[in-house]
Amino acid sequence: MAWNLAIITLVGKDGTKLEATLRRENRGLMCLGNGWKDLSISNGLKSGKSFTLELILENGTPMLSLVSTQSTSHKSQKRECSKHSEKESISAVPSKGKKNRKARSNREERRDSSSAIQNRFVTFTPEDIRDCILILPSQFIKANGINNLGEITLLGQNRMKWFAYLLSMSKDGSLALGSGWKGICEANGVNTGEAFTLEYIDEQETAHGRAQVCFYGVFPGKSVRSFASLRSKWNDLFYDFLREQNLRVNPIIGVAICLCKHHYCNYNSCSLFKPRPKLSQKNLNS
């Protein structure tokens, strides 16, 4: 549907002026109506040839001036103008609907070609941390086929390994990382309140007779030497660390109680650790 807005003057190559109707379609396109065919005929324009109109001002009045012609060979433009033509208008720009469909198609193609790559990455913000555990979105879990709960492997920037536990959180498929994720953040320089990204790696390692899921942190790495000893079992180095942090020994929680204090949890409300003035040698050996 279209309606006339005004009359505009068309100027030929020889300066001849013709009037044409300026029409606006309901999609917002501006079109030339009656009059433009006379300009085409008088200036030798034929079907299949493109032409350019320049907007000029003459005494403050806008006009469209024919400035150039250029031959084209589009087979789809072989139709001649006739008196019985259903439409006597030509759009000044391509159809908006066609442009939108083409743009949408291009976006879908790009999304399909890169979806496999995008699904491997998940970015975490402080809002994804609840009660000292890290929530993994269900979309990320489903896209990568992560189905088994239990121990998984986290890989740092320098390929050092941390072990964490995958826990079930809700019926919508969301899972969470328990103890272990704080260590990789601490060692790779992720500070409190900073977002960080993990990449899923389709690499299966066999440990304890079962496959593990591997992740890779895409943030800058730092020295992990001070935390390397924490990956070992309960030993003197681990107890030394607990003593320095003024924490109780909790064999169920393990490493999480140490790393929790540094950045990622509220010290007063987190249930994963309890401060104590000093650990006696008797308690350490118990």
From Swiss-Prot:
In what ranges is there compositional bias, type Basic and acidic residues?
Answer: 78-89
Aminoacyl-tRNA synthetase in keyword set: no
Under the heading InterPro entries, the entry gives: B3_DNA-bd, DNA-bd_pseudobarrel_sf, REM_fam
- Compartment list: Nucleus
SUPFAM superfamilies for the chain: DNA-binding pseudobarrel domain (SSF101936)
Report the principal subcellular site.
Answer: nucleus
Q: Name one Pfam family in it.
A: B3
Q: Which UniProt keywords apply?
A: DNA-binding, Nucleus, Repeat, Transcription, Transcription regulation
What would be one Gene Ontology cellular-component term for the protein?
A: nucleus
Q: Does the keyword Protein transport apply?
A: no
Q: Where is this region: Disordered?
A: 68-114
Q: Which domain of life is it from?
A: Eukaryota
The entry lists its GO molecular-function terms as: DNA binding
**CDD domains referenced in this protein's UniProt entry, alphabetically:** B3_DNA
| DNA-binding residues (ranges) | 1-70, 119-219
Q: What's this protein's name?
A: B3 domain-containing protein REM11
The species this protein was found in? Arabidopsis thaliana (Mouse-ear cress)
Q: Name the gene for this chain.
A: REM11
